[in-house]
Amino acid sequence: MSIVRSDKPFVLAGRTYQSRLLVGTGKYRDMEETRLAIEASGAEIVTFAVRRTNLGQIEGEPNLLEVLSPDRYTFLPNTAGCYDAIEAVRTCRLARELLDGHNLVKLEVLADQKTLFPNVIETLKAAETLVKEGFDVMVYTSDDPIIARQLAEIGCIAVMPLAGLIGSGLGICNPYNLQIILEEAKIPVLVDAGVGTASDATIAMELGCDAVLMNSAIAHAQQPIMMAEAMNHAIVAGRLAYLAGRMPKKLYASASSPLDGLIK
């Protein structure tokens, strides 16, 4: 049975975005390369680690707010580097203070430094506290559909399952779990972590993900600005392919041209 998919706007915390690509600000050579790559990506949402980024609180060091304008981009402060719920909640409160009441945050609570897997127990605790405090929580999580469901029930505005380990570039390691999450989801689902090149981003979008967040895939490319542009196109292509619906796979060949009326 064929499924006709209609395009739905990408909405987060009541705001509609045209780009379905979210990008990070870390790992670039300098602030100028950061600025140029983000411009080339077409992204409207930019994430940064609160604990590692100068937003004006450190005098004499490069200030992200002087490179990327809050009038042009939506900032998504994240809790990278946090290993328990208390630390993550404290970091989100700091972000709110530094950004004058900004409520949109990306929650990530890590389990260990080797894998950077999410600690889902601490993530659930932190999410519950942050939602109660009025934060709009986008949450980095495992590809476990049950955990994704619980985070949505708590009140998170988006779930962000990893496709592969952070910074690994391994691509979409478990598309089947992502499919289950997508089938059940009542909030946006964004792939977070694992993307290594444009085809990975396209696959994520073809699965039906609402968006993709990446940093290393662009920043660690040999030519980051060119890769940022490639990712922009990949996201659009993947979304269109998802909406169009791919042809069914067949074991045997099927001729493209009709066989009747052949010239003899």
From Swiss-Prot:
Compartment(s) where it occurs, according to its Swiss-Prot or TrEMBL record: Cytoplasm
GO cellular component, one term: cytoplasm
Keywords tagged on the record: Cytoplasm, Schiff base, Thiamine biosynthesis, Transferase
Transferase is among the record's keywords: yes
GO terms under biological process: thiamine diphosphate biosynthetic process
Positions that bind 1-deoxy-D-xylulose 5-phosphate: G167, A193, G194, N215, S216
E.C. no: 2.8.1.10
Catalytic residues (UniProt): K106
GO MF term (any one): thiazole synthase activity
Superkingdom of this protein's organism: Bacteria
Pathway assigned to this chain's UniProt record: Cofactor biosynthesis; thiamine diphosphate biosynthesis
Catalytic activities: [ThiS sulfur-carrier protein]-C-terminal-Gly-aminoethanethioate + 2-iminoacetate + 1-deoxy-D-xylulose 5-phosphate = [ThiS sulfur-carrier protein]-C-terminal Gly-Gly + 2-[(2R,5Z)-2-carboxy-4-methylthiazol-5(2H)-ylidene]ethyl phosphate + 2 H2O + H(+)
Keyword Transferase annotated: yes
Pfam families with a match to the protein in the record: ThiG (PF05690)
Main EC class the enzyme belongs to: transferase
Quaternary data: Homotetramer. Forms heterodimers with either ThiH or ThiS.
Functional description taken from the UniProt entry: Catalyzes the rearrangement of 1-deoxy-D-xylulose 5-phosphate (DXP) to produce the thiazole phosphate moiety of thiamine. Sulfur is provided by the thiocarboxylate moiety of the carrier protein ThiS. In vitro, sulfur can be provided by H(2)S.
Family recorded in the similarity comment: Belongs to the ThiG family.
Protein name: Thiazole synthase
Organism: Pseudomonas fluorescens (strain SBW25)
Lineage summary: Bacteria, Pseudomonadati, Pseudomonadota, Gammaproteobacteria, Pseudomonadales
Gene name tied to this protein: thiG
